[in-house]
Regions:
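Extracytoplasmic
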Residues: 7-40, 231-236, 351
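Extracytoplasmic gate region of multi-pass secondary transporters
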Residues: 27-28, 210-263
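Extracellular/periplasmic helix-loop-helix junction of adjacent transmembrane segments
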Residues: 27-63
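Helix-to-loop junctions at the C-terminal end of transmembrane segments
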Residues: 65-76, 263-274
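Cytoplasmic membrane-interface "Motif A"-like loop-to-helix N-cap segments
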Residues: 74-85, 271-284
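Helix-breaking motifs and short loop linkers at transmembrane-helix boundaries and internal kinks
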Residues: 76, 97-102, 131, 296-297
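Cytoplasmic helix-loop-helix junction between adjacent transmembrane helices
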Residues: 107-144
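Glycine-rich segments within core transmembrane alpha-helices of 12-TM secondary carriers
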Residues: 134-158, 171, 340-352
Length: 396
């Protein structure tokens, strides 16, 4: 790994630091924000508004992923992640100065439009710049830095949420200035000088020729996004004897610890195994355990529960992303990887709407999520055992 490659990896990691940071800022500050900035005080109303805004943010990710995925294949990966972080920074800073909830929703949509491509385009750049075993550690580092972004946001929870938003926006502007000097991917440079450029970023070309890996990789992401959508509702039912906001922060520290462990394990796994199947199977087992044991969790064991849920976090995302990116040609690689991640994230809209309708009755909620978790696990396990991956990007 040369000096320039290390610099590229560092700047990519800092971008995902901000991505994870912002996701966590909303998680740790939304109670205070809704009360102070918009006058929403009822705990159930706060939870429903959180689901609503989360759905809007996920909508921004879906639109942004498709838009910036196409642009990254047409005009370059570096160009896209440079200006998308600028959009995020400006709208995030503006968001703390509005008192109208609908204007706030619009700004959050634009913020997540800007963040949409961070993980997927960074993944594409890593697999295009580095050989597989080094890329595996690069992906682990990317996600671990993202997790530290989440930890930073949780620690910043002692400050005003406005300070947290300003920090995210200003940090994004700093990253924007660093990204001006990054070199473009050699695979994109080759594409740019070839006749294949006319197909670059084509949704029609992607769906017509690569719909199978697109669909199956999306379905594989579902367990992770199911968990990160439902986990705060689970904490709500555990928080009877402790302040909800405090319990969320304790839970998140456990979740982040589990994420880091998972990232490190995935890095070692990729040094010795050429297929992600075993890793996925183990994670699906952990997924089912995490859903079924929550009814036995108390405030005293919430940190450990966070660690368990976190184990299906970083490594699971790293694994599917690294392998999925190699299944598409350069002209649609960014679009495909962005779309898979965005569809996974925006599945949170579906889950969020359902969970919001169940949340008033814990018994019904518990039964329904157990049934849904089993169905998801069965679907993903069938895919894992039956899907034969065909790698297009092959590197030694």
């Amino acid at each position: 790994m040369n000096k320039n490659s290390k610099w590229i990896l560092l700047i990519l990691c800092l971008g995902y630091f901000i991505d994870f940071y912002d996701l966590t800022v909303m998680s740790v500050s939304y109670v205070e924000m809704f009360k102070n900035q918009f006058g929403i005080v009822d705990s159930t109303d706060i939870q429903k508004m959180y689901f609503t805004i989360n759905n809007i943010q996920m909508g921004g990710i879906l639109v942004g992923a498709i838009l910036f995925g196409m642009l990254a294949d047409k005009f370059g990966r570096i160009t896209v992640i440079k200006y998308s972080i600028l959009l995020y920074s400006i709208t995030t800073i503006f968001a703390i100065f509005v008192s109208n909830i609908y204007l706030f929703m619009g700004l959050r949509f634009l913020s997540y439009l800007g963040l949409a491509s961070e993980f997927a385009v960074s993944t594409v750049l890593i697999v295009e710049f580095f050989p597989p075993k080094i890329a595996a550690w690069g992906m682990s580092l990317l996600y671990i830095l993202g997790v530290f972004g989440g930890i930073t946001a949780t620690l910043f929870g002692v400050f005003s949420y406005k300070v947290m938003f300003v920090f995210g926006g200003v940090a994004g502007l700093v990253i924007f200035s660093f990204r001006k000097v990054l070199e473009e991917s050699p695979y994109f440079v080759e594409l740019y000088n070839s006749s294949r450029l006319k197909k670059a970023g084509s949704i029609i070309h992607l769906f017509k020729n690569y719909y199978k890996p697109l669909l199956l990789n999306f379905l594989i992401t579902i367990p992770y996004f199911f968990v990160i959508t439902v986990m705060f509702a689970l904490v709500k039912f555990i928080s009877n004897d402790m302040n909800f906001a405090t319990l969320v922060k304790i839970f998140l520290f456990g979740f982040f610890a589990g994420n880091i462990i998972s990232c490190i394990v995935s890095g070692f796994y990729n040094q010795y195994f050429k297929s992600p199947s075993l890793f996925f199977v183990v994670n699906i087992i952990i997924f089912l355990i995490s859903i079924f044991i929550y009814q036995y969790i108390t405030a005293d064991t919430i940190f450990i529960y966070g660690v368990v849920i976190g184990l299906i976090g970083g490594g699971y995302n790293i694994m599917w992303a690294q392998y999925a990116a190699t299944e598409f040609p350069t002209e649609v690689r960014s679009l495909a990887t962005n779309m898979i991640f965005a569809l996974g994230r925006t599945s949170s809209i579906f889950f969020g709407l359902i969970f919001a309708s169940w949340i008033s009755d814990e018994v019904s909620f518990r039964h329904n999520i157990n049934v849904m978790a089993v169905c998801i696990a069965v679907i993903v396990l069938v895919i894992i055992f039956c899907y034969k991956r065909k790698r297009i990007l092959v590197k030694d």
